[in-house]
């Protein structure tokens, strides 16, 4: 008679020894040793071993059932004679009495195990198989747990979870919108963020809002980007930027304590945008290690090295970064290409021994006494010193990329901590777009200028500052926020500076300008990219590893083969004609 004692594979334990149980799951492997068959059956909780004796009527069925088939087994739990310490259930096995095949599996296209042989695109094509791997299941399960920790903290701190629409209005926010055609021959747009909605909720008096929001951006993809992604979106009324940052810090303290049982180093480090560029060559620096960029321009005032002399006289920059390791030539070639990819004309280097120059690409043309003074002043002893000489923006960008690469090519980089949070503050209000030949918002057009630049931001945009703040974790921007403009005249002035005329302002943003006429509180907020946070917390190589069904690096869903063509009938019904 069948038992009702259904047990998950990973939950077989000492309390069940001698009892009859039912387990249901997938066959990980089966092997015949003499007169016995050993079957490893797994489910989402783990693996358990099943033993089938030769005289058992299901012996041949078990032997012939392929891996990854779905089965049900009834049997008696007993202690194993040879314990497998790598398994949670390694002390136990199940003596099979009955066997049922639910679904027979074909041979999978790759090994379904953590150290799989499947390349990423193949695994994405068969994502339902990839998600059987324990590491992937843990990622997806932990995603839900971590999101719920964020939600729990915010609810406890009087934030209201409010959903905003997916079918929205097209707005110029820096990336391309996904447009949704309708039968009325008009279009919705999928939101790049709930920015305007959450500001309107502040006008509505909702005080503290949050949402686990889906966002959509049709832009170039990188290792840490997806066309659709999830944000923890937050907005508050009447709080200062420092008060918002304090809540955020407490939120991460709570999440990391609950998930990892660790105490984060607090308060989070603060750094101005200009210092981040000056010392790290990045607006999202990884501060787990030092290796700061050095301004060495003045050391070369009297050099005979023509390139550096020319840079000094033209009032450009000679910057350098040092690593306490002798970087091999093969890796130097990689760094040279990396510098060129970041607009530098070249990368010079010197090997330093005991505070003196020993060799390198410019060792024959640079004065040794200058290098010795640099080493003495900056306490450089043994390692490799890299130089870029160019315009300031280029030297910092190139050396910032090289500094970041040190982690991958040198084993001597000393990480000070596992998780290094950093607030980057004092942002410029605008950045200059070489492509558009004009100033654009560094964050978005709703960002409040600082009090010092409130009257001059549209006359002197290069020096305009924003009350904006980014949160960086281990060299990744995980969140960005600001205080918002809450005056309709100031908001209109901002739109006009950004190139919108009166009719465009009315068409695209008339609703928020009108809302601001009916009493709007000072407000501000922040939004966090869930996938980037998870990628760091769960130590994965890509955000695709923490999304159940992601797109690949080209924005293609290989499982569903989308984006895909649409029938002419569907296009005709929507009044759309595609150009060839």
From Swiss-Prot:
Residues at which L-aspartate binds: 173, 217, 443, 484
Swiss-Prot/TrEMBL GO biological process terms: aspartyl-tRNA aminoacylation
Gene designation per UniProt: aspS
EC nos: 6.1.1.12
Localisation: Cytoplasm
InterPro entries (alphabetical): Aa-tRNA-synt_II, aa-tRNA-synth_II, aa-tRNA-synth_II/BPL/LPL, Asp-tRNA-ligase_1, Asp-tRNA-ligase_1_N, Asp/Asn-tRNA-synth_IIb, AspRS_core, GAD-like_sf
Main location: cytoplasm
Descriptive protein name: Aspartate--tRNA ligase
PANTHER family documented for this protein: ASPARTATE--TRNA LIGASE, MITOCHONDRIAL (PTHR22594:SF5), ASPARTYL/LYSYL-TRNA SYNTHETASE (PTHR22594)
Family: Belongs to the class-II aminoacyl-tRNA synthetase family. Type 1 subfamily.
Assembly: Homodimer.
UniProt GO cellular component terms: cytoplasm
Superkingdom, taxonomy of origin: Bacteria
Reaction(s) catalysed (UniProt annotation): tRNA(Asp) + L-aspartate + ATP = L-aspartyl-tRNA(Asp) + AMP + diphosphate
Keyword line: Aminoacyl-tRNA synthetase, ATP-binding, Cytoplasm, Ligase, Nucleotide-binding, Protein biosynthesis
Sequence segments annotated as region (Aspartate): 195-198
Broad class of enzyme this protein falls into: ligase
């Amino acid at each position: 008679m069948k038992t009702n004692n259904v047990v998950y594979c990973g939950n077989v334990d000492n309390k069940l020894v001698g009892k009859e149980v039912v387990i249901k799951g997938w066959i990980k492997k089966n092997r015949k040793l003499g007169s016995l068959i050993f079957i490893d059956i797994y489910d989402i909780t783990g693996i358990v071993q099943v033993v089938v004796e030769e005289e058992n009527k299901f012996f041949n069925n078990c032997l012939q059932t392929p891996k990854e088939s779905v089965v049900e087994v009834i049997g008696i739990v007993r202690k194993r004679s040879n314990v497998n310490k790598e398994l949670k259930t390694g002390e136990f096995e199940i003596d099979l009495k009955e066997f049922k095949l639910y679904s027979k599996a074909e041979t999978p296209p790759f090994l379904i195990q953590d150290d799989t042989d499947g390349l990423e695109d193949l695994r994405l094509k068969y994502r339902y198989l990839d998600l059987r791997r324990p590491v992937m299941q843990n990622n997806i399960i932990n995603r839900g747990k971590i999101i719920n920790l964020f939600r729990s903290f915010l609810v406890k701190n009087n934030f209201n979870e409010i959903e905003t629409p997916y079918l929205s209005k097209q707005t110029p926010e820096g990336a391309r919108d996904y447009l949704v055609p309708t039968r009325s021959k008009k279009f919705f747009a999928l939101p790049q963020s709930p920015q305007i909605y959450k500001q309107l909720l502040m006008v509505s008096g909702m005080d503290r809002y949050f949402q686990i929001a889906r966002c959509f951006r049709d832009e170039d993809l990188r290792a840490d980007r997806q066309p659709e992604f999830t944000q923890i979106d937050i907005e508050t009324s009447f709080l200062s930027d420092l008060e918002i940052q304090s809540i955020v810090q407490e939120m991460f303290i709570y999440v990391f304590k609950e998930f990892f049982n660790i105490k984060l180093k607090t308060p989070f480090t603060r750094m101005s945008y200009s210092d981040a560029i000056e010392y790290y060559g990045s607006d999202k620096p990884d501060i787990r290690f030092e290796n700061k960029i050095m301004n060495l321009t003045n050391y070369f005032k009297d050099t005979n090295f023509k390139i550096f002399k020319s840079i000094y006289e033209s009032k450009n920059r000679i910057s350098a970064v040092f690593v306490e390791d002798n970087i091999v030539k093969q890796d130097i070639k990689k760094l040279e290409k990396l510098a060129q990819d970041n607009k530098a004309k070249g990368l010079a280097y010197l090997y330093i021994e005991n505070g003196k120059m020993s060799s390198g690409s410019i060792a024959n043309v640079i004065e040794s006494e200058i290098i010795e003074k640099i080493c003495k002043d900056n306490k450089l002893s043994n390692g490799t010193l890299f130089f870029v000489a160019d315009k300031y923006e280029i030297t910092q960008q190139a050396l910032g990329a090289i500094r970041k690469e040190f982690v991958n090519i040198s084993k001597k980089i000393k990480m000070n901590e596992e998780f290094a949070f950093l607030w980057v503050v004092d942002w410029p209000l605008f950045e200059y777009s070489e492509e558009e030949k004009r100033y654009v918002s560094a964050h978005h057009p709703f960002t409040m200028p600082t009090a010092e630049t409130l009257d001059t931001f549209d006359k002197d945009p290069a020096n305009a500052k924003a009350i904006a703040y980014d949160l960086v974790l281990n060299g990744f921007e995980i969140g960005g926020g600001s205080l918002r403009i809450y005056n309709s005249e100031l908001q209109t002035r901002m739109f006009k500076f950004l190139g919108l005329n009166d009719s465009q302002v009315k068409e695209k943003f008339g609703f928020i300008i009108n809302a601001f006429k009916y009493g709007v509180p000072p407000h501000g907020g922040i939004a966090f990219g869930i996938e980037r946070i998870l990628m760091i917390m769960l130590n994965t190589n890509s955000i695709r590893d923490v999304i159940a069904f992601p797109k690949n690096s080209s924005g293609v869903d290989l499982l569903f083969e989308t984006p895909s063509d649409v029938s002419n009938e569907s296009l005709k019904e929507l009044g759309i004609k595609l150009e060839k």
